[in-house]
């Protein structure tokens, strides 16, 4: 049985209700399956890489088998997590939508007559291995990827132990933690020397692991939600021409 350390950064100490509901269901299901679970939250840390490094530092002080990153705005199903543990991969994560609407994809979905538009509105946090053509992905099998987000990522302890060999160390100067402690900078935001892109801390983490022979997998079976805000805009009369409201031909009014 596995010992899972759930880590969630919470800027401002805030989280969404769907996250709390999902987390409580996860704890119940992991415990029922014989797994141990512990949770750690990082409040009011505005520097994301430092927050993730500090949570990883806490994880490494204990004896848990897995560090499970879950962002505070993610909705998830406990059965998907159990399958991730059973997959027995060094790094495996779920692919979740970005907080944006892909309008070009929505337009294409409407033109194609898609019935379930909600599944065609998002862009996803993932970099595929082969992004030049079509990639065949089975829903029931892990799929190797170049990088994915730490919003929903399960990492084995052995990954961090191996990465220590080539990861820089900095001394903690935050008064909220023990000053002077040496912390591994697993999560950084460097410029990729090959592409010139500024990498996010999670993509950098994946790139470093793969650069030294590791593999990263996505769990296509995960059904995730990403809580966000949206400004609903519009006007009853969008042009200078008169319009007819109601009746199915014009804007609906209540």
Label for each model-derived stretch:
Residues 53-66:
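Active-site nucleotide-sugar/metal-binding loop of Leloir-type enzymes
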Residues 63-75:
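Short beta-strand-to-loop acidic/aromatic patch adjacent to the donor-nucleotide binding site
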Residues 1-50, 254:
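N-proximal low-complexity "stem/linker" segments adjacent to membrane-targeting elements
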Residues 73, 90, 215:
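Residue-level detector of anion-binding/catalytic polar loops
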Residues 1-5, 165-254:
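C-terminal catalytic/acceptor-binding lobe
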Residues 31, 85, 209-210:
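Anion (oxyanion) recognition and catalysis
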Residues 12, 33, 100, 239-242:
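Cationic, hydrophobic amphipathic alpha-helical membrane-interacting segments
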Residues 56, 77-189:
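Conserved catalytic core of nucleotide-sugar-dependent glycosyltransferases
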């Amino acid at each position: 049985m596995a010992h899972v350390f759930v880590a969630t950064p919470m800027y401002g100490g805030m989280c969404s209700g769907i996250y709390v509901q999902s987390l409580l269901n996860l704890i119940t299901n992991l415990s029922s399956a014989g797994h141990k679970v512990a949770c750690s939250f990082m409040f009011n840390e505005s520097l994301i890489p430092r927050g993730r490094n500090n949570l990883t530092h806490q994880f490494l002080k204990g004896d848990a088998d897995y560090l499970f990153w879950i962002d505070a705005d993610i909705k998830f199903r406990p059965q998907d997590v159990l399958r991730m543990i059973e997959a027995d991969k060094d790094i495996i994560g779920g692919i979740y939508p970005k907080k944006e609407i892909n309008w070009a994809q929505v337009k294409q979905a409407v033109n194609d007559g898609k019935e379930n538009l909600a599944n065609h509105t998002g862009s996803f946090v993932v970099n595929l291995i082969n992004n030049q053509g079509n990639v065949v992905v089975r829903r029931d099998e892990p799929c190797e990827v170049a990088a994915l987000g730490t919003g929903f990522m399960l990492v084995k302890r052995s990954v961090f132990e191996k990465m220590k060999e080539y990861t820089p160390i900095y001394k903690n100067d935050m008064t909220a933690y023990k000053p002077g402690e040496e912390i591994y900078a697993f999560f950084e935001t460097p410029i990729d020397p090959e592409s010139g892109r500024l990498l996010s801390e999670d993509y950098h983490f994946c790139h470093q692991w793969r650069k030294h022979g590791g593999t990263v997998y996505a769990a296509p079976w995960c059904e995730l939600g990403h809580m966000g805000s949206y400004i609903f805009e519009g006007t009853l009369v969008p042009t200078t021409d008169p319009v007819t409201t109601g009746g199915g031909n014009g804007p609906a009014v209540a």
